[in-house]
A protein has these predicted regions:
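Conserved SAM-binding loop of SAM-dependent methyltransferases across substrates and taxa
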Residues: 87-98
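Conserved SAM-binding loop
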Residues: 115-116
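Conserved beta-strand signature within the Rossmann-like core of class I S-adenosyl-L-methionine
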Residues: 174-182
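N-terminal auxiliary segments of SAM/dcSAM-dependent transferases
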Residues: 1-36
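A short glycine-rich, Lys/Arg-flanked "PGG" loop and its adjoining helix->strand segment in the class I
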Residues: 161-174
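Conserved class I S-adenosyl-L-methionine
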Residues: 76-84
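Substrate-binding/catalytic lobe of Class I Rossmann-like enzymes that use SAM or dcSAM, i.e.
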Residues: 182-294, 300-305
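A short acidic, Gly/Pro-enriched loop at the edge of an enzyme's catalytic core
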Residues: 136-146
Length: 306
């Protein structure tokens, strides 16, 4: 069932398709997402330290882990690009906790509007800039680090090289990229007849982690770390399902019963997929390959990430 519910599309990644698909999925309304995601307003896998960790705490822990992998804790004022920034949660965390200067880009009008409101409400306007912009339109800018959380699923294998090349071109020496994405299991595959492709992610394509690491290295990155958070996404989705059930009447009033049931099925089946290892999710850390002297600027161990 998971294979039927969660599939991939062969025609993804173009600007026009991306804009239409992102609007279809994310412009369902900020209030609906608030009911499902909770006050964290973060639509990606969280990181649960233990069974007592709340969803809000787990999302903050995920953001902190990414900040540390990117080295944002090493010095204040580093420039971060958050690709597919959603409602601004990662950007706000990096600015608030580490003094990072953040540019967040999204092609969802609803997300950009709400992200800007949240940034202003948090008093982070001097550090965080939210743009309604495609990441491919950032040529000429330079960043110390890039986070891409839950956006890679919209790229597609055919445009993966373009994606990594663009991001590499935006990084300076020793620049780091953290790619956080759901991975297919058993090779990248296409299924345009899947439930998720038809009703939830009309441009979604999951890529095998092996293809992802090969793609990164082929475009000038040195892959330094790969971590699976599979069990954590199962837990995250169970929290979202519980939130939707708790606020069912309000959700139906916002989006209609059919849409609410589609989301309930999609999230429940996804949770089962992660629980049964039919799906996976990986954080892949790459640095711009240094061909001059091989120095990386990386810590010797993962100890300071935890």
């Amino acid at each position: 069932m998971v294979a039927d519910v969660l599939g991939e599309s062969p025609t993804v990644g173009s600007v026009a398709v991306d804009e239409a698909s992102i609007s279809h999925h994310y412009d369902v309304g900020n209030e609906f997402y608030r009911l499902v995601l909770g006050e964290a307003m973060t639509y990606s896998c969280a990181r649960f330290v233990d069974a007592s960790t709340t969803l809000k705490e787990a999302q903050a822990a995920k953001h902190e882990l990414i900040c540390r992998k990117l080295g944002l804790h090493e010095r204040s004022g580093m420039r971060l690009l958050d690709v597919g920034c959603g409602w601004g949660s990662m950007a706000m965390h990096a600015a608030r906790e580490h003094g990072a200067r953040v540019v967040g880009v999204t092609i969802s009008e609803e997300q950009a509007k709400e992200a800007r409101r949240r940034v202003d409400a948090a008093g982070l306007g001097e550090l965080v800039e939210i743009r309604l912009q495609d990441y491919r339109d950032l040529s000429g800018e330079r960043f110390d680090a890039i986070s891409s959380i839950g956006m890679f699923e919209h790229v597609g294998k055919n445009r993966m090289a373009e994606y990594f090349n663009v991001l590499r071109s935006l990084l300076g020496p020793h620049g780091r990229l953290l790619n956080h994405a759901i991975s297919s299991v058993g090779g990248s595959r296409l299924n345009t007849n899947s439930f998720a492709y038809r009703y939830v992610f009309p441009d979604g394509e999951l890529i095998d982690i092996g293809d992802t690491t090969i793609g990164m290295q082929a475009t000038g990155f040195e892959v330094r770390d790969v971590e699976s958070l599979r069990e954590h996404y199962d837990m995250t989705l169970r929290h979202w399902v519980a939130n939707l059930r708790e606020h069912w009447d309000a959700a139906v009033a916002l989006v209609g019963e059919l849409c609410a049931r589609v989301w309930l099925l999609y999230m429940t089946a996804s949770a089962d997929g992660f629980e049964d290892a039919g799906l996976n999710i990986h954080q892949t850390l790459g640095i711009v390959r240094n061909v001059k002297d091989g120095s990386s600027g990386m810590p010797r161990t993962r100890r300071e990430w935890n």
